[in-house]
Amino acid sequence: MRDVYEVLKEKGITLPQPPAKGGVYTPVQELGEKFLYCSGCGPDLGNGNTVVGKLGKDLTVEDGQKAAYNCVLNLLANLNEKTGDLNRIKRFVKVLAFVNSADDFGMQPQVVNGGSNLIAGPVSYTHLTLPTI
Protein backbone atom coordinates (compact mmCIF):
# COMPACT_ATOMS: atom_id res chain seq x y z
CA MET A 1 0.00 0.00 0.00
CA ARG A 2 1.29 3.48 -0.86
CA ASP A 3 2.14 6.00 1.82
CA VAL A 4 -1.12 7.67 2.80
CA TYR A 5 0.48 11.08 3.34
CA GLU A 6 2.11 11.04 -0.11
CA VAL A 7 -1.20 10.18 -1.73
CA LEU A 8 -3.00 12.93 0.18
CA LYS A 9 -0.32 15.44 -0.86
CA GLU A 10 -0.51 14.35 -4.52
CA LYS A 11 -4.28 14.83 -4.45
CA GLY A 12 -3.99 18.25 -2.80
CA ILE A 13 -5.76 17.03 0.32
CA THR A 14 -4.81 18.60 3.64
CA LEU A 15 -6.02 17.04 6.86
CA PRO A 16 -7.79 19.53 9.12
CA GLN A 17 -7.13 19.80 12.83
CA PRO A 18 -9.18 17.21 14.71
CA PRO A 19 -12.64 18.64 15.34
CA ALA A 20 -13.51 19.99 18.76
CA LYS A 21 -15.45 17.47 20.80
CA GLY A 22 -19.11 18.28 21.26
CA GLY A 23 -19.52 16.35 24.49
CA VAL A 24 -18.00 13.86 26.89
CA TYR A 25 -16.69 11.08 24.66
CA THR A 26 -13.53 9.68 23.13
CA PRO A 27 -13.18 10.35 19.38
CA VAL A 28 -11.17 7.15 18.82
CA GLN A 29 -11.11 4.21 21.22
CA GLU A 30 -8.67 1.31 20.99
CA LEU A 31 -10.19 -2.15 21.38
CA GLY A 32 -7.36 -4.62 21.74
CA GLU A 33 -4.20 -4.21 19.70
CA LYS A 34 -5.65 -4.11 16.19
CA PHE A 35 -9.06 -2.48 16.30
CA LEU A 36 -10.13 1.16 16.63
CA TYR A 37 -13.69 2.31 17.12
CA CYS A 38 -14.39 5.87 15.97
CA SER A 39 -17.16 8.18 17.06
CA GLY A 40 -19.06 10.06 14.40
CA CYS A 41 -17.76 13.25 12.82
CA GLY A 42 -19.76 16.09 11.38
CA PRO A 43 -18.95 18.09 8.23
CA ASP A 44 -17.61 21.25 9.93
CA LEU A 45 -13.88 21.61 9.20
CA GLY A 46 -13.53 24.46 11.69
CA ASN A 47 -12.67 27.03 9.04
CA GLY A 48 -16.12 27.99 7.84
CA ASN A 49 -16.04 25.10 5.35
CA THR A 50 -19.20 23.24 6.33
CA VAL A 51 -22.52 22.11 4.88
CA VAL A 52 -25.86 22.74 6.60
CA GLY A 53 -29.35 21.87 5.36
CA LYS A 54 -31.58 19.08 4.11
CA LEU A 55 -30.84 17.12 0.95
CA GLY A 56 -33.61 17.26 -1.60
CA LYS A 57 -34.85 20.52 -0.11
CA ASP A 58 -31.99 22.95 0.59
CA LEU A 59 -29.05 20.95 -0.74
CA THR A 60 -28.03 19.07 -3.88
CA VAL A 61 -26.44 15.62 -4.04
CA GLU A 62 -23.11 17.39 -4.65
CA ASP A 63 -23.57 19.43 -1.46
CA GLY A 64 -24.24 16.20 0.43
CA GLN A 65 -21.16 14.56 -1.08
CA LYS A 66 -19.07 17.51 0.11
CA ALA A 67 -20.53 17.07 3.61
CA ALA A 68 -19.69 13.34 3.58
CA TYR A 69 -16.17 14.13 2.33
CA ASN A 70 -15.71 16.66 5.16
CA CYS A 71 -16.92 14.06 7.69
CA VAL A 72 -14.30 11.57 6.50
CA LEU A 73 -11.58 14.26 6.58
CA ASN A 74 -12.47 14.88 10.22
CA LEU A 75 -12.44 11.14 10.88
CA LEU A 76 -8.97 10.84 9.33
CA ALA A 77 -7.79 13.80 11.44
CA ASN A 78 -9.00 12.02 14.60
CA LEU A 79 -7.33 8.77 13.52
CA ASN A 80 -4.11 10.59 12.71
CA GLU A 81 -4.07 12.20 16.14
CA LYS A 82 -4.76 8.88 17.90
CA THR A 83 -2.34 6.66 15.94
CA GLY A 84 0.32 9.16 14.94
CA ASP A 85 0.49 7.46 11.53
CA LEU A 86 -2.41 6.82 9.14
CA ASN A 87 -0.29 4.16 7.43
CA ARG A 88 -1.03 1.96 10.45
CA ILE A 89 -4.70 1.84 9.41
CA LYS A 90 -5.12 -1.25 7.24
CA ARG A 91 -8.88 -1.47 6.80
CA PHE A 92 -12.15 0.26 7.54
CA VAL A 93 -14.67 -2.34 8.65
CA LYS A 94 -17.87 -0.30 8.70
CA VAL A 95 -19.16 3.15 7.88
CA LEU A 96 -22.36 4.35 9.50
CA ALA A 97 -23.77 7.43 7.80
CA PHE A 98 -26.69 9.62 8.75
CA VAL A 99 -28.02 11.68 5.85
CA ASN A 100 -30.37 14.57 6.62
CA SER A 101 -32.77 14.40 3.69
CA ALA A 102 -36.29 15.19 2.57
CA ASP A 103 -38.85 12.36 2.66
CA ASP A 104 -38.80 11.96 -1.12
CA PHE A 105 -34.98 11.99 -1.44
CA GLY A 106 -33.59 8.60 -2.45
CA MET A 107 -29.92 9.14 -3.25
CA GLN A 108 -28.41 8.59 0.20
CA PRO A 109 -25.87 5.98 -1.04
CA GLN A 110 -24.55 8.40 -3.67
CA VAL A 111 -24.20 11.08 -0.99
CA VAL A 112 -22.30 8.77 1.36
CA ASN A 113 -19.97 7.83 -1.50
CA GLY A 114 -18.60 11.37 -1.25
CA GLY A 115 -16.86 10.22 1.91
CA SER A 116 -16.37 6.54 1.09
CA ASN A 117 -14.55 7.45 -2.11
CA LEU A 118 -11.99 9.36 -0.05
CA ILE A 119 -11.24 6.20 1.91
CA ALA A 120 -11.25 3.87 -1.10
CA GLY A 121 -9.72 6.28 -3.63
CA PRO A 122 -7.05 8.80 -2.67
CA VAL A 123 -6.28 7.20 0.67
CA SER A 124 -6.17 3.81 -1.10
CA TYR A 125 -7.43 1.48 1.59
CA THR A 126 -7.90 -1.65 -0.44
CA HIS A 127 -10.66 -3.27 1.59
CA LEU A 128 -13.95 -1.44 1.25
CA THR A 129 -16.36 -1.03 4.11
CA LEU A 130 -19.74 -2.43 4.99
CA PRO A 131 -21.90 0.69 4.80
CA THR A 132 -25.03 1.34 6.83
CA ILE A 133 -27.08 4.27 5.61
Name what the model sees in each region:
Residues 1-19:
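Basic, amphipathic N-terminal segments that precede the first structured/catalytic domain
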Residues 67-82, 115-118:
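Short, well-ordered amphipathic alpha-helical segments that serve as non-catalytic structural scaffolds
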Residues 102-125:
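Short, hydrophobic/π-rich interface segment
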